[in-house]
Amino acid sequence: ALPKEGHTLAELPMAKVFNETGIGTMNTSLGDIDKNAMLSFRSSSYGSTSHALANQNAFNTFYGGKAIFYSSGHRTGFTDDHCMYSYRNTRAHNSILVNGMTQKIGTEGYGWIPRWYEGEKIAYMVGDASNAYGKVTSPLWLKRGELSGTQYTPEKGWDENKLNMFRRHIIQLGSTGVFVIYDELEGKEAVTWGYLLHTVELPMEIQELTDEVKVTGRNKAGGISVAHLFSSAKTEQAMVDTFFCAPTNWKNVTNAQGKAVKYPNHWHFSSTTVPCKTARFLTVMDTHGDNRPDMQVVRKGNIIQVGDWTITCNLTEKGKAAIHVSNKVEKVYLNYDAGKKEGATTVTDQVKGKQVNKVLTDYLPDFEI
């Protein structure tokens, strides 16, 4: 028999991480989906084989249950050109390109979520895609590529790995709808770092301001994600509304009216650095509906103010990666410094009126297989 007392989505935590599969979500209002700002994230030890995609350390944003910054491309087939170059491929997702190169296809191109905190006033997760990039080496996918004519070449996005480290820290600032994303990137040599964003419903708006790039994405449900992007290196911005490889309806797929499906273009933004061995990106992602204006994001040096929240981070190529987030009103703090406390993350949160202190270090997934 079903329980007499029903449960609602409002009872679920605002953040949840499943590190064995490499999935994390952050929400502001699960009890009222129409007003919910959501961020989803993937960095999976299972890699990008079968139906999985080469989207390690990629995120998506949503408002009202509808996508804003979202993975692009169409599933036109399993290994056709559009699928391999513009759907499975890292260039189709909200992640990073290294020298314009993408992540491996196969289980070898994996990521993982080494640490996280599911809190009440703050939430946090870290993805590590340091092992995701390089040439495709999977015998299975090499054979599939041979049968389908896939070219695993630098021109198509696969080359020798030039990456040492790619860690992406994501911090949810309570129920504000603001998500802070801090990327620490280290190369084996000087490379270009390409920061990617995509929308699938409406085009993005790009503003190049004095010390930031502001990218605004929208969905058709009135949702907005404003990405305030800061970088340690000089960047060049671009946006296109065409795919690297155009989709074709070669299977003659039809809609409910029996007409052939036409696959629409999506919008693709990139912010690419000059060649450098070390790079850091900071994104203040403000996701909300038409119920409030955009949050004011004010930068003074390495300090950024967003409402009652203060963000301090290393946005230079020198020294160790570091980020500190605090809200003195709520008495909430998060601190990460790769050069201190053996690189641990410390969190102070307020849960049910009581202070909670956590020290987070890397935790390996506990697989059941």
Which residues fall in each region the model found?
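Short, Gly/Pro- and small/polar-rich lid/capping loops
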Residues: A1-A52
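Short, solvent-exposed loop/turn segments at the edges of secondary structure
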Residues: N19-T21, A54-Q56, Y63, N89-H93, ...
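Well-ordered alpha-helical segments within folded domains of soluble proteins
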Residues: T21-M26, A58, R280-V284
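Structural recognition of the beta-strand scaffold that forms the well-ordered cores
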Residues: T25, S40, F59-F62, A67-S71, ...
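Short helix/loop capping segments that flank catalytic or ligand/cofactor-binding pockets
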Residues: D34-A37, T49-H51, F69-S71, F78-T79, ...
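A structural connector/turn signal
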Residues: Q56-N57, R168
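Long, histidine/aromatic-enriched segments associated with O2/redox biology
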Residues: S71-S72, S130
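CBM-like, beta-strand-rich accessory domains located in the C-terminal region of large
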Residues: F78-I369
